[in-house]
Amino acid sequence: PVFDIDYWISFAKSYAESIGLMLDSGAVYCWDNPIAAGVKCKYTERDIRGYLDRYAKDGDITDVWIWYEQTGSSSYEIYIGYA
């Protein structure tokens, strides 16, 4: 199966905006553990929603930025920076 990391980055950005977070490419200096993403990962959507929901409830966090790093041929880590 083919894994489309761009789909998950777009999903995360859209979900962030839908729950009131702003996208800011400068919000890259603080992040929690990256989210595993790839063909074998079952919980990518749950994990993305969980992190973003938690950030949206934190009154000190208003901005996020979402990016990824490739860790293997079809495996990635998704980072959600916040500020």
Region annotations inferred by a language model:
Residues 33-83:
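Extracytosolic low-complexity repeat regions of secreted or lipid-anchored proteins
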Residues 1-39:
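Extracytoplasmic/periplasm-facing segments of secreted or lipoprotein envelope proteins
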